[in-house]
């Protein structure tokens, strides 16, 4: 039986809107049990779909199993079972991990008034101190039970069907928001009433036994919206539904949930937020909303701003708000495979971001997110769910944590990092039913910590040499092997062909010697870098001797909506530099010479629609680039050495005339922003930051200790030590969300 039980014309809009999202979503409906009344609420909004099974090696246990797990009501000893579980949500507070899901009982006879279908919100409680074997043992016992938190069993009106539990915590309080409606039997079918938002708050109490089942005491159910609250929104919205997943507690303590809504015109689904600045006593709707036909929002906080990811008709987008949803700014520019350039009608919902949370690991604030991709060696009907970590400069591909069967639908999951553990609550199929399983991502967390440690070490090292680290995405230096030039930040390696390893780089000694660094080219199993219309690539090169003719040194290949565009720096036999910055491929020879055996610094820069080439920190040439500025660069690659492009003239190779190229390329730095001349000079000079001599010890009368900084504000203290090279960059870029959005595989923010 389908999870959805409604057929109103109002919410049918939501189904139509979200079913347009892709083939995977549409398949959910085709696999639903036809015995259930059609649902407009989340028949396609949620679209959680199914999993073909887990990924080998994961620690996983089933928490909620259809027709097996006993569910206790709030009052009374009589338990019951559910037919299926949907919409996972996961939180932790006061030493208790609480896993939530919709629990559905399906009617076998939709034309029988006595067989009324319903759904409620159920929860399972786990002691966060349990080791994994203990957790598995407890959950596997016959006494393991789930608990009803919000549903008709409590005798409340408009709770026949409760959908999309959305949770967050503040202190020892758990906030649960859900959508609800009642059912009435009219003309031999079930009809739903109007949608309502219900909130219930639980207090985590001190343990009275070894079991966590009584640790959360739930309060009274509260309706969140009234006429004045809705009228204040000014968007003429009429019905609201919780988004599911996770809410957010902002740095200032504001509690935020994401919602979906329809307006009086019934012209599509809108996404927005509801928030409380007084610990849940009163609530306000955001004035701003997403465009029509953009639903299933996920939200997270980053440096005081809200990020909201929405699923639209043909793509996935991200919006940012710095004023609690009064205004939402769409980020411009996306990664390949996400957005309008690769819509869901052609690739389904692959490469879409799913769960998204902001956490602090090892003292570093990062975002964790899951994203579907392509499984190498798998059929087109399967795609793994990947886990990623980003720190607003760079992202790291951790690995697959689930496998999606694209024929049946899509995975739904919720991430939680708490008490030193990383968990994933995930819905997966079990025949006709859906199971909620919990995974503890122990090995994945170890890898994340190792990567974050590497990032910190590299930042400190480069800063000690006065090299700017703000916006530094990747570095190619001394690490190499197996035909690869390893990125020091572990994000993306370059591929090297017929080159000799030297200190900090490679020497290109053959006619076909080259090093290729591909970015913005999606590959499900490759760690990638994501750039938009702002970047700088800086490298050190030594030309050992003059070539026989014009020889490419550094090429960037860009593809926007139109034909390919090339940025190229070459060197000539008469010791001149040559630039090519036009798609007509007409090179310009510069009078400035290169010197054999001397280390030169070369740089390619793209700033909006302006492409520039620099040598030794001085501008060699620049041109306007025919880029739209509205779409991401679909193909983007850097190449050192023999990188032939269409239109290159056939010339006698150095081998044919007895002369081979000899160019050494070392220390390549890639930034997701433009650099100024001072910063490029700092990279070239690499002046160590002087260490301060020990201060003389002077005895001073003790003073009262200053109050400790408020918890959660540790990110306001930022690393320095780059000899001033980062000064301007920090103010200009330090808090810009652009790099973060690109790394996520979403619409990038063009201007802060």
Swiss-Prot record:
Where does the record place its BNR repeats? 274-285, 319-330
EC id: 3.2.1.18
Q: Could you confirm whether the keyword Protein transport appears in this record?
A: no
Going by the entry's taxonomy, the superkingdom of the source organism is recorded as Eukaryota
Return the Low complexity bias intervals. Answer: 701-711
Q: Which positions make up the signal peptide?
A: 1-23
**Assigned GO CC terms:** cytoplasm; intracellular membrane-bounded organelle; membrane
Q: Which reaction does it catalyse?
A: Hydrolysis of alpha-(2->3)-, alpha-(2->6)-, alpha-(2->8)- glycosidic linkages of terminal sialic acid residues in oligosaccharides, glycoproteins, glycolipids, colominic acid and synthetic substrates
GO BP terms, alphabetized = ganglioside catabolic process; oligosaccharide catabolic process
Task: Give, as one word, the top-level EC class.
Answer: hydrolase
Keyword set, alphabetical order? Glycosidase, Hydrolase, Repeat, Signal
> Molecular function terms in GO for this entry?
exo-alpha-sialidase activity
Q: Give the residue ranges for region: Disordered.
A: 693-725
Task: Summarize the protein's role.
Answer: Developmentally regulated neuraminidase implicated in parasite invasion of cells. May contribute to the pathology during T.cruzi infection by cleaving sialic acid from cells of the immune system.
Miscellaneous remark of the record: The parasite mammalian stage surface antigen exhibits extensive antigenic diversity.
Q: Which PANTHER family match?
A: EXO-ALPHA-SIALIDASE, SIALIDASE
Similarity-based family: Belongs to the glycosyl hydrolase 33 family.
**Record protein name field:** Sialidase 85-1.1
**Which taxonomic lineage is given here?**
Eukaryota, Discoba, Euglenozoa, Kinetoplastea, Metakinetoplastina
- Provide the gene name from the record: SA85-1.1
């Amino acid at each position: 039986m389908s999870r959805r039980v409604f057929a109103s014309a109002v919410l049918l809009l939501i189904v139509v809107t979200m079913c347009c999202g892709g083939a995977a979503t549409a398949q959910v409906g085709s696999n639903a049990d036809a015995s259930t009344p059609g649902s407009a609420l989340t028949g396609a909004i949620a679209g959680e779909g199914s999993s073909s099974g887990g990924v080998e090696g994961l620690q996983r246990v089933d928490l909620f199993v259809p027709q097996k797990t006993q569910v206790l009501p709030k009052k009374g000893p009589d338990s019951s079972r559910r037919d299926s579980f949907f919409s996972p949500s996961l939180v932790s507070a006061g030493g208790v991990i609480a896993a939530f899901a919709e629990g559905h009982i399906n009617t076998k006879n939709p034309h029988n008034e006595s067989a009324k279908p319903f759904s409620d919100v159920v929860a399972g409680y786990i002691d966060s101190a349990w080791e994994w074997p203990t957790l598995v043992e407890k959950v596997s016992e016959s006494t393991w039970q789930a608990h009803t938190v919000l549903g008709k069993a409590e005798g409340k009106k408009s709770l026949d069907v409760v959908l999309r539990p959305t949770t967050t915590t503040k202190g020892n309080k758990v906030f649960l928001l859900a959508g609800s409606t009642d059912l009435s039997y009219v003309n031999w079918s079930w009809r739903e009433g109007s949608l309502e938002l219900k909130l219930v708050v639980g207090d985590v109490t001190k343990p009275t036994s070894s079991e966590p089942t009584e640790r959360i005491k739930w309060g009274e159910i509260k309706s969140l919206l009234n006429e004045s609250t809705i009228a204040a929104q000014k968007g003429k919205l009429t019905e609201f539904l919780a988004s599911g997943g996770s809410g957010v507690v902002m740095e200032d303590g504001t509690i935020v949930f994401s919602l979906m809504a329809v307006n009086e015109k019934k012209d599509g689904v809108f996404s927005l937020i509801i928030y409380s600045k007084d610990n849940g006593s009163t609530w306000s709707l955001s004035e701003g909303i997403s465009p029509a036909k953009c639903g299933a929002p996920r939200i997270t906080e980053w440096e005081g701003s809200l990020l909201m990811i929405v699923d639209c008709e043909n793509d996935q987008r991200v919006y940012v708000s710095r004023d609690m949803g009064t205004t939402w700014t769409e980020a411009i520019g996306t990664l390949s495979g996400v957005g309008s350039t690769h819509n869901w009608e052609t690739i389904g919902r692959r490469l879409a971001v799913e769960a998204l949370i902001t956490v602090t690991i090892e003292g570093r604030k990062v975002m964790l997110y899951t994203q579907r991709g392509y499984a190498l060696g798998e059929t087109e009907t399967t795609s793994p769910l990947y886990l990623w970590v980003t720190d607003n400069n760079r992202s790291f591909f951790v690995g697959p944590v689930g496998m999606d069967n694209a024929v049946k639908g899509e995975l739904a999951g919720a991430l939680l990092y708490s008490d030193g553990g990383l968990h994933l609550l995930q819905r997966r199929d079990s025949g006709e039913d859906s199971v909620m399983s919990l995974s503890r991502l122990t090995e994945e967390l170890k890898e994340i910590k190792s990567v974050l440690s590497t990032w910190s070490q590299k930042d400190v090292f480069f800063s000690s040499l006065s090299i700017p680290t703000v916006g530094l995405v990747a570095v190619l230096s001394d690490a190499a092997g197996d035909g690869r030039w390893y990125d020091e930040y572990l994000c993306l390696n370059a591929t090297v062909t017929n080159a000799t390893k030297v200190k900090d780089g490679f020497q290109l000694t053959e006619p076909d010697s080259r090093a290729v660094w591909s970015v913005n080219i999606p590959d499900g199993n490759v760690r990638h870098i994501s750039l938009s219309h702002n970047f700088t690539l800086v490298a050190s090169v030594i030309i050992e001797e003059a070539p026989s003719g014009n020889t490419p040194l550094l090429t960037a290949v860009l593809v926007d909506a139109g034909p390919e565009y090339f940025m190229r720096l070459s060197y000539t036999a008469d010791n001149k530099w040559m630039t090519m910055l036009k798609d007509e491929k007409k090179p310009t020879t510069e009078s400035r010479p290169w010197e054999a055996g001397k280390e030169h610094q070369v740089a390619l820069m793209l700033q909006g629609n302006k492409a520039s080439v620099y040598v030794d920190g001085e501008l060699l040439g620049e041109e306007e680039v025919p880029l739209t500025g509205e779409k991401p660069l679909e193909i983007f690659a850097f190449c050192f050495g023999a990188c032939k492009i269409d239109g290159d003239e056939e010339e006698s190779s150095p081998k044919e005339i007895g002369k081979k190229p000899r160019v050494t390329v070392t220390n390549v730095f890639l930034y997701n922003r433009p650099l100024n001349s001072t910063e490029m000079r700092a990279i070239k000079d690499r002046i160590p930051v002087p260490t301060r001599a020990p201060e003389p010890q002077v005895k001073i009368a003790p003073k009262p200790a200053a109050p400790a900084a408020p918890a959660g504000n540790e990110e306001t203290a930022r690393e320095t030590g780059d000899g001033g090279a980062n000064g301007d960059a920090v103010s200009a870029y330090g808090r810009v969300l652009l790099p973060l959005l690109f790394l996520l595989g979403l619409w990038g923010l063009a201007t802060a």
